[in-house]
Amino acid sequence: LFPQVFNGQLFFTNTSSNGLTDFENFLTGNVQFSFGGGGVYNHTYRQNDSAVFVQDNWKATKNLTLNMGLRTEFLGAWTDGACHIGNIESDLTKSGTYPFIYPSCANKLGVSGLTGNAAGSTFNNSVATGLGPRLGFAWDVFGRHSTTLRGGYGIYYDREDIGAVDQLSFQSPFIPIVFFPGTGLANFFAGASPLLNPNAVPPAGTLSSAWVPCLARLVSFTPNNPAGDGSYACTGGPGVNSTQNLFVLEVPRHFRVPNTQQWNLTVQQELGKNWVLEVGYVGTRGIHLRETRDGIQSVNATPQNPFTVTDVNGNHYTITNNTFSNAIARTPTPGLNGYSGYQIFANDAYSIYHSLQTTLSRRWGSNYLQAAYTFSKNIDATSSGNTAFNTAYNDQSNINASRGLSDFDRQHRLAVTYVYQIPAFQHSKGLLHAALGNWAVSGVSIFQSGTPFSILDSGSGDAFLGLGSTPLLGASLAPGASIPSGLTSGSLQSRVAKGYLNPAAFTPASLLYYPNISASECSAPTGPDPSGNTCVTGFGNLGRNIYRGPREQNWDTSLIKFFKIGERNEVRFTADFFNVWNHANFANPAFTDVEVGSAFGKIFNSTGTP
């Protein structure tokens, strides 16, 4: 289980300091950060769900039918029969309270310093209850079956999958995680205590008291000193593994499950003989959706908004600038590492979908034609339930900073489906009928918008987030540029050949203190700050998913031949032709990180058929 954790992982990213892409850094062995863990990995996960419902169909009048129902869900939180999970309540550190939460069964594990008093799920409530009403109607408006109005509304709950409890299994001392710059991987399996080596992890299958966490306390600190990061002591709590060196994972202790509201209103109108038109509005709203982020990222300290820290003796220190060294001290929850050692797995994301959906269809004889067009917009705070990396964009302290078009949004989509019985030679006889009669053609043709994408800067935000904390950091517009100017012009073929994006329209996020020079100049010995400690970047000013990839189309066609066998049987021969025009659908630009150099904004791949 979790081989990627116990074997360790190396990560290669795009880097501005040497101008290399992630793959080039891989080829040269230039590791940006590493990840690994050890400990116990056996679990006995359990979850209990139940539901009751009532439902009835009522024909209120001869023209109106109602469908009504109510479903009540009782969705249980996951527990672990092996008791190898733990949680953390980060806000407790603000009052100096030990933040780690373990189930009461942890007292039976016989590990010195490991105690628990929480429920088996570690949550305050172990069951989430939800009411799911259902209401639908169908109305024959004029009583002639030519005009029908249909509508419906419902709330639907989604049982939480195993992801949440998996997060809890990575808590120290069960599977301590270390997440350090690349050179730290060399010491992962040294076998030393974390007191001697902060990168050490326990051997696989070992549950050791050496990795029971304690809450770190600030002992001394020199504010606004670029080279000073303060010193910490392990004084808070029963353990010895200091939290400023730990990667901790939090799941909010109020258990809730995602739910979706869906509604629709559609009118169906008969248009002459065999033609039917449907026009409808369909909407969906999701709340309590899963997301992962660093909710306690290092704060922005300025002379106008200073940040004050307090040491174990009650001395106060005021921070008015942002450096790499004081990043952990700028964590809003004292003692934790909000710079690169924390992830929250929360159900506080959301989504909203609105659409106009139309369908025009006709049936005549054995023939059929349908054209379905959708004009829609899907917005969310995050489009992924990834549990390994943060899914929020840019500022991790505010989930609304990630609001944008969904990764899978397609503004326009037209699908045409048809079956056509070729009338020629239908009534011929003999060999002519056998060879040329009873042929048909069918197919599906799809035309749709491309999917959205963002312009990224892997070097941005390092004043607030450590390397590897999130893959979704935005770049900035270049001075004088606009969002439309970020796209090149011309035919799609020419843009694929020369570049889909205009590199001159974008720039890496600015340095907080030296906005007019590049990060590489700042870190050079001759730069404004030879130590490099104040050469930190803020977040870019570009939003999430502001551009859209190439539109797509596809034609699939079938040629069908029927052979009659007697009066009641037939044999059908079908030849299928996929992408019959051999039309290439191009993927989004392969590299949208402004740090990658000449590969930026170019399309190198095609995508599958829509």
Model-derived features with residue positions:
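Signature of Gram-negative outer-membrane beta-barrel scaffolds
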Residues: 1-142, 388-391
